[in-house]
Amino acid sequence: MATIKDVAKLVGVSTTTVSHVINKTRFVAEDTTKAVWEAIASLNYSPSAVARSLKVNTTKSIGMIITTSEAPYFAEIVLAVEEYCYRQGYSLFLCNTQNDAEKVQNHLDMLIKKRVDGILVMCSEYTENSLALFNGTNVPMVVMDWGPNDGKSDRIIDHCLDGGYMATKHLIDNGHRDIAIIAGYLYKTTAKARYDGFVKAMTEAGLLIRKEWIFENDFQPEGGYESMNNLLNQDKLPTAVICGCDAMALGVISAITEKGLSVPQDISVIGYDNIHSSRFYAPPLTTIHQSKTRLGQMAIDTLLERIQQHNEQPSEPVTPKVLEFYPELVVRSSVRNLNQ
């Protein structure tokens, strides 16, 4: 196997010159640069990415810790992040926690050992041990709205409480008074914030929040399906159901139609996230829009800026940034107007 010394010997230059050509860390004459690359090709020399990263202090890689890349909302964000990383010349290490807090710590440990330049976090399964692990390193990090607040990382706030309020207010404005909610598990930051938005809107309108109409479940179609079936077994039914996410709404609609009822004629349904497939539901789903592409680009831009600052001034303390973007209502066909 060829080494950098073999390349230098063939060209008649020092190994330092070859290194500068490969890493583009110093100007090298055009003829010499061409000769180095020709020698690399002829010898089939493959520079060690690890060794190169030790010299230039970068691996051109980013780690992303996410609850699950299988869920449509997360999958769309991962796609946006990966595409934007690619355009910026970075590789992406994707780590799924699958709702396992222990995996967060293991993934953090692995990413740090791989010397990634920065880390994105999009999960709620975060322990004090995980925080201690990260705080013991200098790896730049950006945390999404539902992640931990360690006082050190940049954060992106998506104002999902406002989104939950917006969804509920839309139902109220359309004449609905008997409203149920099928939320994600409320120990998760994002599920709790969306639920709090529901409570705020119902309270402002002076409407009764029935405990028997509050459900918690997985952010999956199965979770929505199970909870909706439990709701349909009750004597009194709501005129509308708020879903913690669009994936849950798919299960909710399935449960309603299997009972011989219709959406929205019998029960209206509103989702959250505006995933790509929600427009193709039957009926097309009214939902709360969260721009996955914008979120992904904002996260990467923020992280790359922090990485650059870290490389240029590693000992300089930084003040964490808070970036914000807001949800929007997307009206389709799954909510009936009872005022008409």
Swiss-Prot record:
InterPro entries: HTH_LacI (IPR000843), LacI/GalR-like_sensor (IPR046335), Lambda_DNA-bd_dom_sf (IPR010982), Peripla_BP_I (IPR028082), Tscrpt_reg_HTH_PurR (IPR023588). Residues 2-56 form the HTH lacI-type domain. Hypoxanthine binds at Y73, K188, T190, F219, D273. Keywords: DNA-binding, Purine biosynthesis, Repressor, Transcription, Transcription regulation. GO terms for molecular function: DNA-binding transcription factor activity; transcription cis-regulatory region binding. Gene3D superfamilies: 3.40.50.2300, lambda repressor-like DNA-binding domains. The keyword DNA-binding applies. The keyword Transcription regulation applies. Residues 4-23, 48-56 bind DNA. GO terms for biological process: negative regulation of DNA-templated transcription; purine nucleotide biosynthetic process. SUPFAM superfamilies: lambda repressor-like DNA-binding domains (SSF47413), Periplasmic binding protein-like I (SSF53822). Pathway: Purine metabolism; purine nucleotide biosynthesis [regulation]. Consists of two structural and functional domains: an N-terminal DNA-binding domain, approximately the first 60 residues, and a larger C-terminal domain, approximately 280 residues, which imparts the function of corepressor binding and oligomerization. Homodimer. Is the main repressor of the genes involved in the de novo synthesis of purine nucleotides, regulating purB, purC, purEK, purF, purHD, purL, purMN and guaBA expression. PurR is allosterically activated to bind its cognate DNA by binding the purine corepressors, hypoxanthine or guanine, thereby effecting transcription repression. This is HTH-type transcriptional repressor PurR. The gene is purR.
